[in-house]
């Protein structure tokens, strides 16, 4: 295995193990991390995080998906430490509920008026979209 990955949330350590690759939803777009990646600290956006191989899955080529609700990532010496506001595995998300929540959040965003309502609707939309994306990766819906 190439990377030691630790994902921590305020409630508990979420996941700790080895993997071959991780794709993070950073503030500037998706960032892939492989063995011997340059050291970096980056902000994480609300979005889908993917982990390939190792203890994350039964197969070297299998991807596992997680919804991350923002945070930070530190990459250094083949260790990836993620401090996330919240994290949830695709396996723990109901696909139908995720789809319904996404469609509702999208509709609410489109009809939002006023700055506060738009900001709240945008965050709810990003959150619902992340959950729906990771379920689609896992369930292929």
From Swiss-Prot:
Keyword Ion transport in annotation = yes
Its annotated compartments are: Plastid, Chloroplast thylakoid membrane
Q: Which GO terms describe its molecular function?
A: ATP binding; proton-transporting ATP synthase activity, rotational mechanism
The alphabetized list of GO BP terms reads: proton motive force-driven ATP synthesis
Q: Which UniProt keywords apply?
A: ATP synthesis, CF(1), Chloroplast, Hydrogen ion transport, Ion transport, Membrane, Plastid, Thylakoid, Transport
- In the UniProt record, does the keyword Transport occur? yes
Q: Which HAMAP family match?
A: ATP_synth_epsil_bac (MF_00530)
Cited function: F(1)F(0) ATP synthase produces ATP from ADP in the presence of a proton or sodium gradient. F-type ATPases consist of two structural domains, F(1) containing the extramembraneous catalytic core and F(0) containing the membrane proton channel, linked together by a central stalk and a peripheral stalk. During catalysis, ATP synthesis in the catalytic domain of F(1) is coupled via a rotary mechanism of the central stalk subunits to proton translocation.
Question: To which protein family does this belong?
Answer: Belongs to the ATPase epsilon chain family.
Tell me what else is known.
In plastids the F-type ATPase is also known as CF(1)CF(0).
Q: NCBIfam families given for it?
A: ATP_synt_epsi
Q: What is this protein called?
A: ATP synthase epsilon chain, chloroplastic
Q: What is the name of the gene encoding this protein?
A: atpE
